[in-house]
Amino acid sequence: MRAIRLAAALAVLLAACQSAPPDFAEFSSPQSPVNVATHIAENVGACWFGGERSAFAEYSYAPELNSYSNRPRVLIVPKAEPHGLPKLVIEASAASRGSSVKLFGPMMAGPEAQAISRDVARWVGGATGCG
């Protein structure tokens, strides 16, 4: 009986030590931050909001491409709260060779995170269209 309790306790401890999947993603692009963010924004509009993607039905997007901080971004916000906190941020910033594109926000911890990352990775690489 004691061995069973010990095994159960060990299983609980090991499960607690498991790291959660990351709630962000980061990609590199040879393009300038404004160019890569513009390309991403065009594809976000066409693929996520121009089609039948039900995961984005409750949201709208707000491209902020004219950035004084040189960090243009695309925000995914709830339709009901367009000025509320974004649920997804796609931000481009200058890097040593081109741009770094970061994705973060609550949607990156949700069921669409992998599909979001795959789409943005393609667009950062210069591809167009929906996956």
Task: Indicate where each model-derived feature is located.
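Sec-dependent bacterial lipoprotein signal peptides
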Residues: 1-17
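Ser/Thr-rich, low-complexity intrinsically disordered terminal regions
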Residues: 18-131
